C-alpha cells in the first residue's frame, strides 16, 4: 500500500478476463439522438482494431513501420479503439497529441514522422484556410482517415497537401464501419 492510501477493505476478484467482459464505456457523439453510454467488450475493441488493420486498399497498414497521428480525444472510439488497436495489432505506433490545434498540426505531423493521420470534418477547412506552411508538403503521410468532409473540399485538400482523405463512417454502438478504401473512390 502506498503511503497515505488506506488498504482496501475488500479482496479483488481473481479470475481470467473473458472476451465478453466490459473493457470500456464510451459515449456516442449523439448523431442519432442524445449521446448514450456504450458498454464495449474486449472482443469489440479487438475486432474493431482488427477490422481497421485489415482493410487494405488505400488504407493498407504495413507492420512495424506506421506512425498513426491522432489528434482526436481518447474518449472517442476513433483514437481509443480503432487507431490504438490497429497500431497495437500491427506492431505500429500511435502518436497521440493532447488535442487538435490547427497552429500545431503540420509541425506535429512532420516531427512525429506520421505516415497516417486521423481527422474530423472540421479539421480540413481549418487547414485549407491557413497560409502555406513549410511542412505541409514535407511530410511522410500516405493517407488521412476520418469523416465529415464535404466532397468539394477533397480535391483541394489532396492537391495542396499531397495525400488522400479516406472517409469512414461508423457507430460506436455496433462495432461496424464502412470506408471508401478501394479504387475508384466515390467521394
Across the structure, where does each feature detected by a protein language model lie?
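Conserved adenylate-forming
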Residues: 9-20, 25-70, 90-92
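Short beta->alpha linker loops
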Residues: 44, 100-101, 122, 149
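Generic structural marker for isolated residues within well-ordered, non-membrane alpha-helices
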Residues: 25, 83, 124, 154
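Conserved AMP-binding/adenylation subdomain of ANL enzymes
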Residues: 46-67, 75-116, 126, 130
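Conserved S/T- and glycine-rich ATP-binding loop of Class I adenylate-forming
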Residues: 22, 28-31, 68, 74, ...
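A secondary-structure boundary/capping signal
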Residues: 41, 71-73, 98, 120
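Gly/Ser/Thr-rich phosphate-binding loop
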Residues: 89, 106, 111-119, 128-187
Amino acid at each position: 500500500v502506498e503511503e497515505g492510501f488506506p488498504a482496501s477493505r475488500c479482496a479483488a476478484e481473481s479470475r481470467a478476463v473473458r472476451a465478453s467482459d466490459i473493457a470500456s464505456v464510451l459515449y456516442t457523439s449523439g448523431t442519432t439522438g442524445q449521446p448514450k453510454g456504450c458498454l464495449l467488450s474486449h472482443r469489440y475493441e479487438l475486432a474493431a482494431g482488427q477490422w481497421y488493420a485489415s482493410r487494405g486498399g488505400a488504407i493498407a497498414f504495413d507492420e512495424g513501420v506506421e506512425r498513426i497521428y491522432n489528434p482526436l480525444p481518447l474518449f472517442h472510439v476513433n483514437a481509443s479503439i480503432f487507431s490504438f488497436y490497429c497500431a497495437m495489432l500491427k506492431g505500429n505506433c500511435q502518436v497521440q497529441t493532447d488535442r487538435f490545434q490547427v497552429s500545431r498540426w503540420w509541425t506535429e505531423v512532420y516531427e512525429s514522422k506520421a505516415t497516417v493521420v486521423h481527422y474530423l470534418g472540421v479539421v480540413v477547412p481549418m487547414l485549407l484556410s491557413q497560409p502555406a506552411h513549410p511542412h505541409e508538403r514535407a511530410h511522410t503521410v500516405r493517407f488521412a482517415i476520418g469523416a465529415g468532409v464535404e466532397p468539394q473540399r477533397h480535391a483541394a485538400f489532396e492537391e495542396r497537401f499531397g495525400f488522400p482523405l479516406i472517409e469512414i463512417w461508423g457507430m460506436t454502438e455496433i462495432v461496424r464501419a464502412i470506408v471508401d478504401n478501394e479504387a475508384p473512390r466515390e467521394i
